[in-house]
């Protein structure tokens, strides 16, 4: 969901930068550490990107502190560029959504926020949304056929494929749709 249909990075950068430029930011201890570590009162994608060599620990901690329990944040994230086009293509297959929750410290607001986003933007019921960190466990359907996972992290698609599913590393909507079209015309389509 995040990085495929939803632009989590854009949403979280806007939220963090709004707080860092405020005279009284939420979680000021975390905000001050970000400003001290980066030497500026704003972050960029590289400061929070999961596998970026320039990732900031202070910015990442602030990100979790700000949004892990903010249901409104999760339910109002923007669409990923190309996300609507991708959804228009894949919805014909009646897909489920498989997404990782940000459930740090036992908080579940990201789950309810993501469910709201899915309902409002995709029109799906909660039964069509699955939350899991170990996405590979969903690689094969109950009837033994491989499922398809579209994810923006190879650390998710590779184990999914190794477990018998079809993992598609999402780079952009056009590329993912092309891969799906090839699968549809091959014997590998579920």
Please provide the spans of the model-predicted regions.
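Short amphipathic alpha-helix with an adjacent loop that forms part of the alpha/beta core around
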Residues: 138-143, 179-189
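Acidic, Mg2+-coordinating phosphoryl-transfer loop and its flanking beta/alpha structural elements
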Residues: 145-182
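Short, acidic loop-to-helix structural element flanking the phosphoryl-transfer center
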Residues: 50-97, 107-112
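A structural signal for well-ordered alpha-helical scaffolds and beta->alpha junctions
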Residues: 5, 9, 80-83, 108-115, ...
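Short, structured coil segments at secondary-structure junctions
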Residues: 91, 125, 162-164
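Substrate-recognition "cap/lid" segment bordering the active-site pocket of phosphatases
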Residues: 98-147, 154-157
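Active-site neighborhood of HAD-like aspartate-dependent phosphohydrolases
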Residues: 1-65, 162
């Amino acid at each position: 969901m995040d990085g495929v249909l939803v632009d989590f990075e854009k949403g979280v950068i806007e939220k963090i930068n709004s707080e860092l430029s405020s005279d009284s930011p939420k979680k000021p201890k975390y905000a001050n550490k970000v400003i001290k570590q980066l030497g500026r009162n704003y972050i960029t994608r590289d400061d929070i990107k999961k596998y970026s060599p320039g990732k900031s620990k202070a910015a990442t901690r602030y990100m979790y502190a700000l949004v892990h329990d903010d249901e409104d944040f999760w339910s109002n994230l923007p669409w990923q560029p190309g996300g609507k086009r991708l959804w228009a293509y894949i919805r014909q297959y009646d897909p489920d959504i498989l997404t990782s929750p940000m459930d740090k410290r036992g908080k579940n607001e990201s789950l309810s926020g993501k469910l709201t986003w899915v309902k409002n933007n995709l029109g799906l019921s909660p039964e069509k949304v699955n939350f899991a960190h170990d996405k590979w466990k969903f690689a094969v359907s109950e009837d033994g056929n491989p499922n398809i996972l579209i994810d923006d992290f190879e650390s998710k698609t590779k184990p999914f494929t190794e477990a018998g599913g079809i993992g598609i590393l999402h780079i952009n909507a056009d590329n993912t749709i092309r891969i799906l079209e090839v699968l549809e015309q091959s014997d590998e389509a579920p």
